[in-house]
UniProtKB/Swiss-Prot annotation:
Domain of life: Bacteria
Record's subcellular location: Secreted
Organism: Aliivibrio fischeri (strain MJ11) (Vibrio fischeri)
Protein name per UniProt: GlcNAc-binding protein A
Gene from which the chain derives: gbpA
Residue span(s) of domain Chitin-binding type-3: 443-484
Entry keyword DNA-binding: no
Molecular function terms from GO: chitin binding
Keyword terms: Chitin-binding, Secreted, Signal
Cleaved signal peptide residues: 1-23
Length: 492
């Protein structure tokens, strides 16, 4: 394997940089870089096909932070953790299969590798390693996956690469390979005991990287979402006159497995290749053959067909979630007693929801409040004790919100608080309701007493006691006073 001994350094175009970040750098293809790193393509689409890596985890927010122990290959990240630099937060990068990551086309020979810096460091070296020709693309990356002699090495003499403009590139001689390979770029900084590890997924084509000139890319099938059974995904084909619906290829999802994002992309690409003469989907080899992928699939248009582009459309089922709350146990009336009035309620939920219940009196004063989270099918009992109990109209207001806090429905139910009912004697069986008219009482006067019974004033000489009552002298009050029997006879 050849190892280049001379490198060409090129300062490239300006890019803005934030001086407040503490992160560092990544392999990019912003200007003339041959390929962006696996981490970079988690955040930025490719410059030509707009492909991106999916399900990357936290690295999609900070591809510049894939930093691990220096000293590769003797030291550095452990086998199986090389792509993520040994950092648990970037462990998704360690996944490795033949179709997991977007691959960038490359050819052997002189190629430019570009770095984007968000904060620069004094630098010892950049080193580039490549997988062996017979490596296993379906096994995690280990030291045994790579030729551990770097095919390119640049000494930088503890200087800082340019930060603004903050892309920096150098030329390397890429050795011969075939098919899918992984390049490991290691930036060894000089002011810490760390290095930055960027793996780059590339593909060597048998014809030296030149795509069959009879085909040009006109679109991309991306696994943007899972689809439900019965939903449809289809191509929208455009020529100079606009959309040509007769060239559309449609896939109806038949089962849950087919609806998984990586599966339907493969199925749609396969169907395109069966149905269309001037459209192909998948990886294109030097023989003009297409291989559908489980994941992103480029869509190609045949030269001379008059076709301009292909977009992807969806016909999705919109299933509105159902929310319903049954409240049982609310009575129309509650009798006021000596203790606080309580509402003993049972709640039954359809759909996941947050429920807020509030009791108001007629004056709109809140007397009780509770919040309950219910899952679909849940049943729960709640007891609401009112802060005060006064006779009259009251309201129970229920507010149903989804799990995002959005109001779904509000309902109000009326009820009343009533005082304990008193059954008076039949009309005409008493003359007064005690103590009304107390000064007019005489022998034979009948009164309705506080205990709801009727009493009759005794004959002389005891009748004189019947009028002896004030709010502070109640001993002759009928039925309840300490000496009531001296003045009164109980009638019922």
């Amino acid at each position: 394997m050849n190892k280049s001994s001379t490198k060409t350094l090129i300062a490239l175009s300006m890019m803005a940089v934030s001086s407040g970040v503490s992160a560092h750098g990544y392999v990019s293809e912003t200007n003339d870089g041959i390929a962006g790193s696996r981490a970079a393509l988690c955040k930025f689409p490719t410059s030509d096909t707009q492909e991106k890596n999916r399900d990357c985890g936290a690295v999609q927010w900070e591809p510049q932070s894939v930093e691990g122990p220096e000293g590769f290959p003797e030291k550095g990240p452990a086998d199986g953790q090389i792509a993520g630099a040994g950092l648990v937060q970037f462990s998704e990068l360690n996944e490795q299969t033949a179709d997991r990551w977007v691959k960038r086309p490359i050819t052997a020979g002189a190629q430019t590798f570009e770095w984007t810096f968000t904060a620069n460091h004094v630098t010892r070296t950049w080193k580039y390693y490549m997988t062996k020709q017979n490596w296993n693309p379906n096994a995690v990356l280990t030291r045994d996956s790579f030729d551990l002699t770097p095919f390119c090495e640049l000494e930088y003499n503890m200087e800082k690469p340019p930060l603004y403009p903050n892309t920096f590139s150098h030329e390397c001689i890429v050795p011969e390979r075939e098919g899918y390979q992984v390049i490991l770029a290691v930036w060894d900084v000089g002011d810490t005991a760390a290095a930055f590890y960027n793996v780059i997924d590339v593909k060597f084509d048998g014809n030296g990287g030149v795509v069959d000139p009879t085909w040009s890319q006109g679109g991309q099938i991306n696994p943007t979402r899972d689809l439900n059974v019965g939903e449809r995904v289809f191509t929208r084909v455009f020529d100079a006159s606009g959309e040509n619906v007769s060239l559309s290829t449609e896939l109806v999802i038949e089962n849950e497995t087919q609806g998984q994002a990586n599966n339907w992309t493969h199925a749609l690409a396969t169907k395109i290749n069966k149905e269309q003469q001037n459209i192909g989907a998948g990886q294109l080899n030097d023989k003009g053959e297409f291989s559908p992928q489980y994941g992103p699939n480029p869509v190609y248009l045949k030269a001379g067909s008059g076709l301009k582009s292909v977009e992807i459309g969806y016909q999705l089922e919109t299933v509105e979630p159902v929310y319903h709350l049954d409240i049982e146990g609310l009575a129309s009336e509650y009798t006021i007693g000596d203790s606080a009035t309580e509402l003993d309620l049972s709640l039954y939920a359809t759909g996941d929801m947050n429920v807020e219940l509030t009791v108001y009196n007629h004056g709109k004063e809140a007397l009780a409040n509770t919040n309950v989270t219910l899952k679909d099918g849940d049943a729960k009992s709640v007891v609401m004790a009112l802060s005060k109990s006064e006779k009259g109209h009251h309201m129970l207001v229920s507010r149903i919100k989804n799990m995002d806090g959005e109001l779904i429905k509000q309902d109000m139910s009326d009820f009343h608080l009533v005082e304990e009912a008193v059954t008076p004697p039949p009309s005409g069986d008493f003359d007064f309701v005690f103590p009304e008219g107390v000064k007019d009482y005489k022998a034979g006067t009948k009164v309705l007493a506080e205990d709801s019974n009727v009493y009759q004033c005794k004959e002389f000489p005891y009748s004189g006691y019947c009028v002896q009552w004030t709010e502070t002298a109640t001993n002759f009050a009928p039925g309840v006073g300490s000496d009531w029997s001296m003045a009164w006879d109980k009638v019922n």
